[in-house]
UniProtKB/Swiss-Prot annotation:
One of its GO terms (cellular component) is cytosolic small ribosomal subunit. Belongs to the universal ribosomal protein uS17 family. The gene is rpsQ. This is Small ribosomal subunit protein uS17. It comes from Heliobacterium modesticaldum (strain ATCC 51547 / Ice1). GO terms for biological process: translation. The keyword NAD does not apply.
Length: 87
């Protein structure tokens, strides 16, 4: 049997936790504009599985690619990197 390939990981900020055991994570990346050369911020949202419902809005989390869990969920929360400050 062959070894499993290294899974993709991303670090992003939780933008929504309204769903049961699911959070929406916004991952920001910087790309260079193909024509003008300027660095542009690009944000992509991922739905990620949060088994313990531990994530709050504003938390910085690490997510890892996994098998499809639903129509749109293919990521899971690995760890909370930084908790949000509640004011």
């Amino acid at each position: 049997m062959s070894e499993r390939a290294e899974r993709k990981t991303r670090i992003g900020k939780v933008t929504s936790n309204k769903m049961e055991k699911t959070v929406v994570v916004a991952v920001e990346s910087r790309i260079q504009h193909p024509l003008y050369g300027r660095t542009v911020k690009k944000t992509k949202k991922f739905k990620a599985h949060d088994e313990e419902n531990a994530c709050q809005i504003g938390d910085v989390v690490e997510i890892m690619e996994t098998r499809p869990l639903s129509k749109e969920k293919r990521w899971r929360v690995v760890r909370i990197v930084e908790k949000a400050v509640i004011v």
